[in-house]
Amino acid sequence: MSTQWEVVIGLETHAQLSTVSKIFSGASTQFGAEPNTQACPVDLALPGVLPVLNRGAVERAIRFGLAIGATIAPRSIFARKNYFYPDLPKGYQISQYEIPVVQGGAITIQVPANEKAGKPAYEKTVNLTRAHLEEDAGKSLHEDFAGMTGIDLNRAGTPLLEIVTEPEMRSAAEAVAYAKALHALVVWLGICDGNMQEGSFRCDANVSVRPVGQEKFGTRAEIKNLNSFRFLEEAINYEVRRQIELIEDGGEVVQETRLYDPDKRETRSMRSKEDAHDYRYFPDPDLMPLVIGRDWVERVQAGMPELPAAMQQRFVEQYGVSAYDAGVLTSTKAMAAYFEAVVAKAGAANAKIAANWLMGDVSSQLNRDGIEIDAIPVSAAQLALLLQRIADGTISNKIAKEVFATMWEEKASDDGAADRIIEAKGLKQISDTGALEAIIDEVLAANAKSVEEFRAGKEKAFNALIGQAMKATKGKANPQQVNELLKKKLG
């Protein structure tokens, strides 16, 4: 990208709230039901029906606001956003416009290094404008109806929290880092399941460019319904290139809504972009103002989980792990809980080795099997015992990997699985000094050339001798003792 242009990005994210019923009706929000089986008279906008606000949706919005340090509006109102679309039976969407329930707040993001561009990793705080409650629309189905469109209203009325940032991001990398941080937070808080394939978390990106140093924003295009982090990055990068090329060729960027085509990896025009006045917002006369007292906020605050940033700092201080390791361990609530359960069983002295195992062997196996840590077949108690056996010298770290693989495959239910497998396979580490000395004497006698090379100053020869000793014991020798005994015998 030309260095004379600055990219300006703001994101609007729709997080589907994890309530069992819809925001203004008692209909179910369960995903995947047969079309139009979860739409009640309120969702269908039948004559005479009235909306009733779901308290659980409000509490989830409060929880989010508290987590980002936002202001919870003591009084907010719902408005009608008027537009016509076949999957919107009322002819308007109930949303919030002038006074949203969550105002302000910020999220700190970690932007990874871009080695190709020579850019180091850095931290940035993205300020939020607002987060407001609204209902989702239904779904138009085009594929199964030749020449027609089917309408499924199961999704109509599903509660959404629309989270809007200030236009403060300056690259696709920053936008993706923000989206990932936001996704992790709403899942951590338990207010959204974060399932992007099912549409529970989707982003709209407002993208514009302007000459470096210019204060006035360029004309923006909005890219709708990006439901993967990869699509978000690709769509923004394409749109930035498109706008720069258009301007440099003498054209003008048009304010419009665009869609991203993942097959062609390009954005295309959908419709001209509406402004707020096009929707004729006005307060919904069927809904009273939403009044949130201080006592309500305090009750929600009392039930808040420990937030990732606070837990990360605690892990550094309490367990002595690095800030990076603490960040990985608190990437999900399930990962953090598993780590603490392992340490509780294995002892705080084994916290660092527990962290190394979770980020190494455990994560590798999870990725290989395509599962999350809450479905791990090795319990925290089982892993803790394995780590204790490394610490007390019963087995080496190398043998522990073999034991762990067996535990994973057999999905054992007994907490003592590690001891059972070690005993059954005869994997106990040889730590008897006399036995090891006898083995090392044999190794030295059989490898006179390596002994000569080591004494001539070749350090690699020493490693070769260690390898021979480990081979002679089938990997069961205590590596540290082998090292010490070899040094002693070689003088």
UniProtKB/Swiss-Prot annotation:
Transmembrane segments: none annotated. Belongs to the GatB/GatE family. GatB subfamily. It catalyses: L-glutamyl-tRNA(Gln) + L-glutamine + ATP + H2O = L-glutaminyl-tRNA(Gln) + L-glutamate + ADP + phosphate + H(+); L-aspartyl-tRNA(Asn) + L-glutamine + ATP + H2O = L-asparaginyl-tRNA(Asn) + L-glutamate + ADP + phosphate + 2 H(+). Its EC number is 6.3.5.-. GO terms for molecular function: asparaginyl-tRNA synthase (glutamine-hydrolyzing) activity; ATP binding; glutaminyl-tRNA synthase (glutamine-hydrolyzing) activity. InterPro entries: Asn/Gln-tRNA_amidoTrfase_suB/E, Asn/Gln-tRNA_Trfase_suB/E_cat, Asn/Gln_amidotransferase, Asn/Gln_tRNA_amidoTrase-B-like, GatB, GatB_C_1, GatB_Yqey_C_2, Gln-tRNA_amidoTrfase_suB_CS. Heterotrimer of A, B and C subunits. SMART domains: GatB_Yqey. PROSITE patterns: GATB. One of its GO terms (biological process) is glutaminyl-tRNAGln biosynthesis via transamidation. Pfam families: GatB_N, GatB_Yqey. This is Aspartyl/glutamyl-tRNA(Asn/Gln) amidotransferase subunit B. Disulfide bonds: none annotated. NCBIfam families: gatB, PRK05477.1-2, PRK05477.1-4, PRK05477.1-5. Keywords: ATP-binding, Ligase, Nucleotide-binding, Protein biosynthesis. Allows the formation of correctly charged Asn-tRNA(Asn) or Gln-tRNA(Gln) through the transamidation of misacylated Asp-tRNA(Asn) or Glu-tRNA(Gln) in organisms which lack either or both of asparaginyl-tRNA or glutaminyl-tRNA synthetases. The reaction takes place in the presence of glutamine and ATP through an activated phospho-Asp-tRNA(Asn) or phospho-Glu-tRNA(Gln).
